[in-house]
Amino acid sequence: MDAGSLDRLVQFQRATITDNGLSQVETFTAHGFPVWARKTDISDGERFRAGEVAANITTRFVVRWSYFTRDMTPKDRLTCEGRTFDISGIKEPEGRRQWLEITAAARAD
């Protein structure tokens, strides 16, 4: 893979816990600067849960390895082109400290 295939900007988000006086609320805010990524949709589908049909899409993002991106975990999420993705897995696909492959899912509707 080459850097020219990184054609999408993604923004990582990290959860912070805030106290609103009645309870603690988890909110996601931008974490760091946007990062260039390659985006590949790998599957889609529908689920019927609690009386509602929800369409979802699973996507694989590849980003350059850096000390910032290696700090991402499945507790974080990312946004790309207005859609928010929950991260389900992160791995180094080839070579050491070159790329990170992030598998994430989002609602398609």
Residue ranges and their predicted role:
Residues M1-V25:
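Active-site-proximal polar cores
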Residues G4, V25-D109:
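Short, conserved turn/kink motifs that form compact alpha/beta structural patches or helix kinks used as
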